[in-house]
UniProtKB/Swiss-Prot annotation:
The gene is hslU. This is ATP-dependent protease ATPase subunit HslU. SMART domains: AAA, ClpB_D2-small. A double ring-shaped homohexamer of HslV is capped on each side by a ring-shaped HslU homohexamer. The assembly of the HslU/HslV complex is dependent on binding of ATP. It is found in: Cytoplasm.
Length: 446
């Protein structure tokens, strides 16, 4: 990650409106990962990431910042909900499975990168195997060694037809590696580590065996290309790199952290909630977790926690956990102007998406400026009157607004005389005005 904080914020601005403080905090945290890697080895070990706590109502961009950050970071990234985990000893997943899942994500990410690198070599090898199946090499009169006439006119002709896709529907018999025998193991919750170890034990069964299959050329080419690419990837080197990537660049986003905060003096289930927080402490502070890659140290993994904190407060978290999340950023509730910008400014905005979807049926719609403004006002009003669900309210309103158009798109496209359907303030009021004014209806429909 060589992007500067300013560049990271600029990239996040393409997708998320407002919330500048949160964007700056994650941009600095991400850049600090790169800065740390430039330090001498002895000093590098001492520099630990400053974990972040994002506080803000639902639907204002907390999760979206995490999603976009994952794409920008090009680093092992995992998003989890704190509510999925339970204290060790209770039924449910234990928090160490976060690191095991992060390790799996790292292997998957690096394998995809490696397979992209060897793609051209794999395509060439796959092409030769398909041509061998289409044109079995002639055998010598004395001996078993096949003779492949690389430059034979027939082979070159078939190669050309194969590349042009003329042979895609032709069926061939080809030898491909058998898939390893998948073993489904059911274990009690909280024993994922044992499940993983048993699956690894049985993973090698049937590996290396080949069998002949009758496939269409297009399907065979894809299968053989993937097989050749997998053969070109060095698994041991891949695992070593994945282990380093998890330890040095891993990012974990823990959503709904407020749901495991203890609220007031209530008892009962809160015992398990506080237990989850205490189990998270060593993970965030730095400990060693056993994964299929080996022992993973969590000292330099960046943790970003977020929560709406409607019913609980950040101070309701156990003090030790508060101390391990030193950077606090508050995300603001959305204003009517923010809703207006969300509808038009981001890359692939909601209005752009709906227009493109209807365009596939030949129906053109156009969102007028006053229509967007009125839609933003209604979204804000409904959020104020009922439950505030942030930008997610726009999805509900747009579905309702365009319900009739979406249902009759094919018929309307045939009647359209070249003029697009204009979504202006009058159209918005006609379809949403009454619903927005009636609070009882708003609660159930919008």
């Amino acid at each position: 990650m060589s992007m500067t904080p300013r560049e990271i914020v600029h990239e996040l601005n393409r997708h998320i409106i407002g919330q500048d403080d949160a964007k700056r905090a994650v941009a600095i945290a991400l850049r600090n990962r790169w800065r740390r890697m430039q330090l001498p080895a002895d000093l590098r070990q001492e520099v630990t990431p400053k974990n972040i706590l994002m506080i803000g109502p639902t639907g204002v961009g907390k999760t979206e910042i995490a999603r976009r950050l994952a794409k920008l970071a090009n680093a092992p990234f995992l998003k989890v909900e704190a509510t999925k985990f339970t204290e060790v000893g209770y039924v449910g997943r234990d928090v160490e499975s976060i690191i095991r899942d992060l390790a799996d994500a790292a292997v998957k990410m690096l394998r995809e990168q490696e397979m992209t690198k060897v793609r051209h070599r794999a395509e060439d090898a796959a092409e030769e195997r398909i041509l061998d199946a289409l044109l079995p090499p002639a055998r010598q009169a004395f001996g078993d060694e096949p003779v492949r006439s690389e430059d034979s006119n027939t082979r070159q002709l078939f190669r050309k037809r194969l590349r042009e896709g003329q042979l895609d529907d032709k069926e061939i018999d080809i030898e491909v590696a058998e898939s390893p025998m998948g073993v489904e193991i059911m274990t009690p919750p909280g024993m994922e580590e044992m499940t993983s170890q048993l699956q690894n034990l049985f993973a090698g069964l049937g590996k290396g065996k080949k069998k002949s299959r009758k496939l269409k050329v297009a399907d065979a080419l894809k299968l053989v290309r993937d097989e050749e690419a997998a053969r070109l990837v060095n698994e041991e080197e891949l695992k070593a790199r994945a282990l380093e990537a998890v330890e040095q660049h891993g990012i974990v986003f823990i959503d709904e952290i407020d749901k495991v905060a203890k609220r007031g003096n209530t008892g009962g289930a809160d015992v398990s909630r506080e237990g989850v927080q205490r189990d998270l402490l060593p993970l965030i502070e730095g400990c060693t977790v056993n994964t299929k890659l080996g022992m993973v140290k969590t000292d330099h993994i960046l943790f970003i926690a977020s929560g709406a904190f409607h019913l609980a407060k950040p101070s309701d978290l156990v003090p030790e956990l508060q101390g391990r999340l030193p950077i606090r950023v508050e995300l603001k509730a959305l204003s009517p102007q923010d809703f207006e910008r969300i509808l038009t400014e981001p890359h692939a905005s909601l209005t752009e998406q709906y227009a493109a979807l209807l365009k596939t049926e030949g129906l053109n719609i156009e969102f007028a400026e006053e229509g967007i403004k009125r839609l933003a006002e209604i979204a804000w009003q409904v959020n104020e009157k009922t439950e505030n669900i942030g930008a997610r309210r726009l999805h509900t309103l747009l579905e309702r607004l365009l319900e009739e158009v979406s249902f009759s798109a094919g018929d309307l496209a045939g009647q359209q005389s070249g003029e697009p359907i204009r979504i202006d303030a009058a159209y918005v009021n006609g379809h949403l005005g009454e619903l927005a004014q009636d609070e009882d209806l708003s609660r159930y429909i919008l």
